[in-house]
Amino acid sequence: MYNESPIIRRPSTRIYVGNVPIGDGAPIAVQSMTNTKTTDVAATVAQIRALEKVGADIVRVSVPTMDDAEAFKIIKQSVNVPLVADIHFDYRIALKVAEYGADCLRINPGNIGNEERIRSVVECARDKNIPIRIGVNGGSLEKDLMDKYREPTPEALFESAMRHVDILDRLNFDQFKVSVKASDVFLAVASYRLLAKQIRQPLHLGITEAGGMRAGSVKSAVGLGMLLAEGIGDTLRISLAADPVEEIKVGFDILKSLRIRSRGINFIACPSCSRQEFDVISTVNELERRLEDITTAMDVSIIGCVVNGPGEALVSDIGLTGGHAKSGYYDDGVRQKERFDNNKIIDGLEAKIRAKASMMANRIAITDKTE
C-alpha cells in the first residue's frame, strides 16, 4: 500500500508543552483555542474536554485579565490536556499563570512591552521549566515596523520574530517555539519560509483569522499544506470562526491528506453519479457521524459502482463497491464472499468497520509491547 509520506521534515530542536513533545521529529501536534469567557470556568472546562475528546494535543486559553488568571488556575486543575496561556499587553499575567501551572506561555511581540518585561517572563518560564511561544501576528506588528514597511510584509513579520528570538538567545533561553501568522496565505507562507531558513526552533503554523468553516478550512488547507509539504511545521492550529472542535477535525484532515499523521477513519468516497447503485452521499455522511469515536487510523473506501470501486478497495482496509441490489465488500483489499443489501449497507458496514478498527488497535498494542 502506498501510504508512506515522502515529506522530509525540517530539522528542529525539541521542547515539551506539558507531556507533548514538539519538534525534532515528534508528531505534529494539533491544537485549538477556547472561545468561551475564561472566567466562565464551567463552560471553558466543558469546551476543553470536548476538544480533548476529538484528539486535541494542546489547548490555548486566552487570559486577558487577572480575574481570568484566577479562573485559569481552576481550569488547569480540571483538565488533562496541556494548556497554553495566551497573554497580550500585561506581562504580569504571564507571571501569574506560570505560577498556576500553565504548560506554555504565548506572548505577542507587538504588545507585550520592552525587553525588561520579556526578561521577567523568560526568567519565570525558566524557573517553572515551561516553554514560550513567540507569537507574531500580521495584525498587531510593532509600530516602528509598520512605519518602516508601511504594511505587514514577510520581512516585517520575520523581523518582529527575530527581535524576540535574539532576546531569548541573549538570555540563554532555548525552550521556545515561534509563529508568524497572517490572514493572507502568501504572506504567512513567505514569512514562515524566511523563519525556517534562519532558526532551528520548532514552528507553530497557522493562517490567522482564516474565516468561517468552509472558506477558513480551504484557506488553511492551502497555506498549511504548502508549508507542511516542504517539511515546515511542528504544531498547528486551524483558526476558524466556528466551533473549536471543528478546528481539530480539520487539522487532522490536513495532516491525514499529506500522510503526515493519521487519526480515525480516512473515508475515500466518490462524489456519485447516475451509475451509483446506492446513495453514496447519505451513506458516507451517516457513517462519518456514527464512527467519529474511532481513533484507529484506517482507510475505508465507499464507491458507488464498479468503475473505480475495486481499485480503491484494493488499497483500503475496508472497501465497498456498489453492485446491482447488493454491493461487494472487501477486507484488506480482498473481496469477500459476503455482500451487503444496498438498503442495509450502513448498519452492516458500521459493524465491519468497528470490528476491523478493534482488531487493528489490538495489533498495534501488541506490537508496541514487544518493541
From Swiss-Prot:
EC number, UniProt record: 1.17.7.3
Annotated [4Fe-4S] cluster binding sites: 270, 273, 305, 312
SS bond partners: none
UniProt keyword Iron present: yes
Pfam families: GcpE
Annotated Gene3D superfamilies: Dihydropteroate synthase-like (3.20.20.20), Sulfite Reductase Hemoprotein, domain 1 (3.30.413.10)
Cofactor annotation comment: Binds 1 [4Fe-4S] cluster.
Reaction catalyzed: (2E)-4-hydroxy-3-methylbut-2-enyl diphosphate + oxidized [flavodoxin] + H2O + 2 H(+) = 2-C-methyl-D-erythritol 2,4-cyclic diphosphate + reduced [flavodoxin]
GO BP, sorted A to Z: isopentenyl diphosphate biosynthetic process, methylerythritol 4-phosphate pathway; terpenoid biosynthetic process
Listed cofactors: [4Fe-4S] cluster
Pathway assigned to this chain's UniProt record: Isoprenoid biosynthesis; isopentenyl diphosphate biosynthesis via DXP pathway; isopentenyl diphosphate from 1-deoxy-D-xylulose 5-phosphate: step 5/6
Function, as annotated: Converts 2C-methyl-D-erythritol 2,4-cyclodiphosphate (ME-2,4cPP) into 1-hydroxy-2-methyl-2-(E)-butenyl 4-diphosphate.
UniProt name for this protein: 4-hydroxy-3-methylbut-2-en-1-yl diphosphate synthase (flavodoxin)
Gene name per UniProt: ispG
